[in-house]
């Protein structure tokens, strides 16, 4: 891994035993035409996730890198850990449960890296083409997305989709706070970059169960939304651009 890759695939894992190897197999199968690295962040799992990640580094020593949190810090902290180590110009965020499809990355890649790509594009946000959730979960997601979109004007309709591709430069400009991963589109817009939404595939998780319950998601989400509204509307810093900055 001496040369910098074009893409860093960043995957947080917490208690995803049974998912690690299948997810990484699919990443390697889908992205064969792109130079990439995979950064896996183990957020203090207490199942066989760590052992499977050790197996992965032995199987793909040229592409897979693993970072272990000593104690659980949450998804946003895991993403920041991976970001600090990312070497690609773009960072692909995938969930560790296999619901996101890396073949969508291969399909979209020419549209944001080719000769006619928009230099001001900071984020491609996935919008799930066919949700694999039950009726109640689908309803709460629609409601939450509508409230968030009205409050933040972030140009996306499905912020809960874990599939996101970000320009690494833009990612590194974002302020860190717990649960920031819920608001990447709004944060990217706040920093002066463009956001684009694309339809992506959605599948049932491969193994295990979701880590998020309805009440916990609702309570934390509302508190974070109020804080994010303040940040977007009152906390925007003065932004200086060099002459060749694409956002100038």
PLM feature segments, named:
Residues 87-89, 146, 150, 160-174:
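Conserved nucleotide-sugar donor-binding
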Residues 143:
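Active-site Tyr-X1-5-Lys
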């Amino acid at each position: 891994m001496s040369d910098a890759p074009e893409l860093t695939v960043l995957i947080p894992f917490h208690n995803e035993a049974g998912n690690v190897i299948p997810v990484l197999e699919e990443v390697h199968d889908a992205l064969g035409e792109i130079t990439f690295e995979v950064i896996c962040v183990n957020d203090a799992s207490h199942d066989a996730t760590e052992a499977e990640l050790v197996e992965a580094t032995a199987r793909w020593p040229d592409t897979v890198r693993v970072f272990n949190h000593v104690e659980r810090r949450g998804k946003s902290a895991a993403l920041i850990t991976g970001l600090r180590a990312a070497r690609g110009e773009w960072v692909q965020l995938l969930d560790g449960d296999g619901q996101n499809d890396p073949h969508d990355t291969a399909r979209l890649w020419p549209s944001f890296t080719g000769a006619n790509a928009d230099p001001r594009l900071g984020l491609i946000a996935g919008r799930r083409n066919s949700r694999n959730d039950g009726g109640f979960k689908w309803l709460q997601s629609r409601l939450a997305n509508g409230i968030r979109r009205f409050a933040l004007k972030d140009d996306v309709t499905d912020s809960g989709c874990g599939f996101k591709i970000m320009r690494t430069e833009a990612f590194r400009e974002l302020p860190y706070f717990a649960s920031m991963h819920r608001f990447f589109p709004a944060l990217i817009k706040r920093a002066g970059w463009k956001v684009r939404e694309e339809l992506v595939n959605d599948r049932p998780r491969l193994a295990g169960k979701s880590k998020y319950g309805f009440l916990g998601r609702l309570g934390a989400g509302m508190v974070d939304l109020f804080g994010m509204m303040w940040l977007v509307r009152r906390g925007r810093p003065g932004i200086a651009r060099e002459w060749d900055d694409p956002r100038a």
